[in-house]
């Protein structure tokens, strides 16, 4: 049988034992052991003995503590296994098969590496990657399933304001925008190489969003304009004017035909962008009493809950893709609108600025985050009642995203829905019946943390 200890480990053990015997006033026993293990007195002198004194006792007590910890963990594991075994099959089935009613509650990971506040987050449409952008001028790529930092992207010279994944399925890109007035495109399949920098805005670029099914990207800026870019060439193909102050946020409809924008002019504006060369301003929504920070299109699954409020009947087989939308404002409220510009409901509950919104892919809920440090869940089937409030961060919450769904029965596994790269909601333009919902939500905050809530 091979020895359990290396020669060095055995020598250390022998010296510790001899030091223990000497300290215990057992010199004859110590001398006998020294002879047995061939340790001469000049090798194990009084100075060496002093150095090893107490080492055996420390190792012994450490082993005892570890043994107790192991026993405690084994007991806890047995308790949890018993609880799992005793849970009813029906309850397990409900947890596993009812993502439409899932709401975030438990933080799976609290990820830390940024050196300043986190401004934005975005899920990769296919892989378990998530990007976060910060005032520290960097973008960090994480594995949200493992809770591990994968890489840090450097290139911007000022705060990173927004990030978004999108583009063609076979060539997904990450877009980022910054207070340095630039937009950068990064290629995930090439170690996130910065393949292009888009210049044209005259002030802070506050938001970027890919348009589904097209090689186009929309950006919003403090220069009061929005721009549409061709990501294959890097050229600006259209500048959209209309807002009279800083454009804070943009959202793209699930079919890619409509753009929704909000700004410091306290307006929300709906645009038809189906023909880029002839963009049409459809509607201006008025009602907020302060700057509008964020916006989101409602997914098709929300139609059944919001249509009665708008006096509409059963959802037609084909809609304009922009039936309902939501806005969040510095007046602490959230408003739900229809495409006619009518405010259907105002959600009151936050105690400070509303910073980000996302609709539940199941359509029944709207989620929001705020400078009041909370994440709130609103039930659209109960007149927008707030049904859950979470203390999400230790300071202002800046950003919120829902992981995009994955298309079912797609060979090769490359079947993510086209949505996270298109809209904050993380759902695509495909038939919802063909999308498998993922119960994963991410938030970012002034506490420099990225948090992952997962079912």
UniProtKB/Swiss-Prot annotation:
SUPFAM superfamilies: Lissencephaly-1 protein (Lis-1, PAF-AH alpha) N-terminal domain, WD40 repeat-like. Belongs to the WD repeat LIS1/nudF family. This is Nuclear distribution protein nudF. One of its GO terms (cellular component) is spindle pole. Self-associates. Interacts with nudE and dynein. Transmembrane segments: none annotated. Dimerization mediated by the LisH domain may be required to activate dynein. Residues 408-431 are annotated as: Disordered. WD repeats lie at residues 113-154, 156-196, 200-239, 242-281, 287-347, 349-388, 392-438, 440-455. Positively regulates the activity of the minus-end directed microtubule motor protein dynein. May enhance dynein-mediated microtubule sliding by targeting dynein to the microtubule plus end. Required for nuclear migration during vegetative growth as well as development. Required for retrograde early endosome (EE) transport from the hyphal tip. Required for localization of dynein to the mitotic spindle poles. Recruits additional proteins to the dynein complex at SPBs. HAMAP family: lis1. Residues 9-41 form the LisH domain. One of its GO terms (molecular function) is dynein complex binding. The gene is nudF. Residues 61-88 form a coiled coil. It is found in: Cytoplasm, Cytoskeleton; Cytoplasm, Cytoskeleton, Spindle pole. Keywords: Cell cycle, Cell division, Coiled coil, Cytoplasm, Cytoskeleton, Microtubule, Mitosis, Repeat, Transport, WD repeat. One of its GO terms (biological process) is establishment of mitotic spindle orientation. Gene3D superfamilies: 1.20.960.30, YVTN repeat-like/Quinoprotein amine dehydrogenase.
